[in-house]
Regions:
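Bacterial N-terminal signal peptides that target proteins for export
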Residues: 1-12
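Disulfide-bonded cysteine motifs in exported proteins
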Residues: 4, 32-35
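Electrostatic cytochrome c docking/interface patches
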Residues: 17-32
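His/Cys-centered metal/cofactor-coordination and adjacent catalytic loops
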Residues: 22, 47-60
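The canonical Cys-X-X-Cys-His
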Residues: 34-43, 97
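Detector for the c-type heme attachment site
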Residues: 41-46, 62
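Extracytoplasmic electron-transfer domains, predominantly the class I c-type cytochrome c fold
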Residues: 56-105
């Protein structure tokens, strides 16, 4: 009886452990993009950007090597148009966002 309880308990533990795992860098990067970029940019592989002049994030690798964006993100992104806020990301945010952008290539 005790063995059955322990066996079922261990099986249950193994089943719920993935759900409790910490988010991956890609997941955190997507969450960052959703919170900070999606108002204007398409952040997935297929949709159009809500703001027509804002390039979809999935096309950034066509313009720049993704790794080359690291310095720009660290120094702060600023643009010539007033609608886009200036961004300066910390190293963890940069890693997460670049990890997510690589999934869109």
């Amino acid at each position: 009886m005790l063995q059955n309880v322990l066996r079922h308990g261990l099986i249950g533990l193994f089943l719920i452990t993935p759900a409790l795992a910490a988010p991956t860098a890609e997941q955190r990067g997507k969450a960052f993009a959703r919170a900070n970029c999606a108002r204007c940019h398409a952040i997935d592989r297929g949709s159009n950007s809500p703001l027509r002049i804002a390039p979809p994030l999935r096309t950034l690798h066509n313009r720049y090597p993704i790794e080359a964006l690291e310095e720009a993100l660290a120094e702060g992104i600023s643009t010539g148009h007033p609608g886009m806020p200036a961004f300066e990301l910390d190293p963890d945010q940069i890693h997460d966002l670049l990890s997510y952008l690589k999934t869109l290539e």
